[in-house]
């Protein structure tokens, strides 16, 4: 349990939204630094925007946050913002997120891919889902996929699929990867309950995911919880 706490507490992903080179075109957005201390507030802002339909710009902020380390982060963010600035596209994006949150089928995942103009994407569409409902859904990227492949048996999930990855680690958005994500989601939900009970503090599936992400990056071994 202590290793889980250490991993979560040392998670330090920091993003300066001001660095988006199109920030001046979106007053009131892209104007703060996101750290673990205000990450939940950032998630909640996105959730409110989707539920109320008031500001597609919040989705652009989440996109920039996710692809911050990418060399083409500005282009990816601008493409999404241009796409969602069309009212019917923003409406479909909101519907797609709500639908997959209530019914996480592969078909609804494909719908979300299209809705966020990421027909070949995996990590970014799931980032929107995880931000929308962090009490149920974790994120997944190559670091998570690597950890899952190496550790799922240790934690009692050996019969479940691994993510299909390219040589560079990128997750291929196929049915097997989706099935692996559903198992990963179940694991995060299971461990959020165990950690909340054993740590006597609230852990969400998103918190479990962040601990795993940090552990994989720092080569920390996380113990199996009973």
What are these regions (language model features)?
Residues 126-131:
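Internal, hydrophobic cores of structured domains that mediate oligomerization or house catalytic pockets
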Residues 1-116, 134-226:
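An N-terminal alpha-helical hairpin/helix-loop-helix interaction module that forms a charged
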